[in-house]
């Protein structure tokens, strides 16, 4: 009977750890060998609230940016992120990157990491951003 109780306790403990790990992985995870984090929009919003000095990069075109963007974002098109060009921010700054759907932001985050930026996070596309946007 003691063995059955011990087995049940171990299984319950293991399930609790697995649930906590799954929740942690769904909010942020390091992309292996990519040098940047992938965040949910909710985790990105929390980071922006906790660090008002974080740089929010919209890597879409200027026209897309003008059509609506996240408040506080800076338009820095993915095509303009080139290794031979200087960056307009420090490489150790917290940088959060987004685009329309997530493809360009992942590419931009990878390029920024390759250029030596050490605190880059990609949270995908504005189409998944459930919070306020602006055209200002």
Report residues per predicted region.
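Rhodanese-like catalytic fold shared by cysteine-dependent sulfurtransferases
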Residues: 2-50, 54, 63-94, 100-136
